[in-house]
Regions:
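C-terminal transmembrane helix-loop-helix hairpin of multi-pass membrane proteins
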Residues: 20-42, 220-329, 334
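Structural signature of hydrophobic alpha-helical transmembrane segments
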Residues: 56-67, 117-129, 174-190, 232-244
Length: 334
């Protein structure tokens, strides 16, 4: 049915429908969080190479970001083709367009920032490809939608450390403050901690997760000290480093792969600290990354288990539901 628009000040005649006012697009709350996150990690990379003494080649961040963009583009095309839908980057909304590319930008910079491969660039690019592509493969029915559950950057780094450990390791923690003097060294973690706390408190709403993670980390340090005789200042000293602050405020709090409600967020952070303590008791290296991988994987498996249990209950209810009784004079259709 065609819609007739009446002139200004004239009511529509009978049988005509006034044109509906355009409904403004609802702002996605993820956009502002991802935008600020991408901006902060980009600025930190610039400072890292110019002021802090990062040892990776200057061109590698550009390689990593371009690799992340290309991987996201290719796998989004494949996913859209397989699911018979429009690719996410084909949109007229500039915010939605940016929202598609921002996670890849963050992942590329994070993988390059946290991995060190000497003069071999391909292990870092391998980590970026694994990190971006797994979002289209490792998915679970979370809150009624299929979503990825593994932290992208952390998963790519962990897989690379496991498979290419001969050529690559984590970035040495000293590089984050290598060129800084004593006072500047104290300011760096404070600035990162303040910026990350504001970002997570105001935008991602992950304060409960950080509290659970930080509190649990301190508790596991005391437990390891009492049971295994670990030096307490060594176990707690990890929390004062720039690498730990970066991991806590920018890696653990990924909005897409962490819970949204208060108690699950707190339990996620506490579980991460508990798994970290267990891995440390077994002298496993790269503990932070592997612990986060284990917790994210358990969360994804939990969502799949809940999905199958719900499906099983639905099938049982359908089988045991009573059939409608026949009404006299009316045929029962089956």
């Amino acid at each position: 049915m065609a819609t007739t628009v009446s002139p200004a000040g004239v009511a529509p005649a009978e049988g005509q429908t006034a044109a509906a006012a355009p409904v403004p697009l609802k702002k996605d709350p993820r956009y502002q969080a991802l935008r600020n996150f991408a901006l902060s990690i980009s600025v930190f990379n610039i400072f890292g190479y110019t002021l802090l003494g990062w040892e990776q080649p200057y061109i590698w961040p550009f390689f990593a970001v371009l690799t992340a963009y290309a991987t996201e583009f290719v796998f989004e095309l494949l996913s859209a083709w397989a699911q018979h839908r429009q690719p996410a980057f084909r949109t007229k909304d500039p915010r939605a367009f940016m929202l598609f590319w921002l996670p890849a930008h963050i992942t590329g910079l994070a993988c390059n920032m946290l991995l060190y491969a000497n003069n071999q660039w391909w292990p870092v690019m391998f980590a970026v490809i694994i990190a971006v592509s797994q979002k289209h493969v490792l998915r679970a029915p979370i809150a009624g939608r299929m979503r990825h559950f593994m932290n992208p950057s952390n998963f790519g780094i962990s897989v690379t450390l496991l498979t290419l450990g001969t050529w690559v390791s984590i970035s040495p923690p000293y590089q984050f403050t290598e060129w800084a003097n004593s006072y500047f060294k104290l300011m760096i973690p404070m600035v990162i901690l303040t910026a990350g706390t504001v970002l997570n408190a105001m935008l991602t709403k992950k304060t409960a997760l950080i509290v659970g993670w930080m509190g649990g980390f301190a508790i596991q340090a005391f437990v390891r000290h009492w049971i295994f005789g670990v030096q307490l200042n060594t176990a707690l000293g990890v929390m004062t480093g720039v690498a730990f602050v970066l991991f806590s405020n920018y890696m653990v709090t990924d909005p897409a792969t962490t819970p949204t409600k208060f108690l699950p967020k707190f339990m996620f952070g506490s579980s991460l600290a508990a798994v970290y303590g267990i891995l440390m008791a077994f002298n496993i290296v790269y503990t932070l990354f592997f612990a986060l991988c284990i917790v994210c994987a358990c969360r994804g498996l939990g969502w799949w288990a809940a999905h199958f249990i719900a499906k099983r209950r639905e099938s049982r209810a359908a089988v045991t539901s009573p059939q409608p009784s026949a009404i006299p004079g009316q045929a029962v259709t089956t």
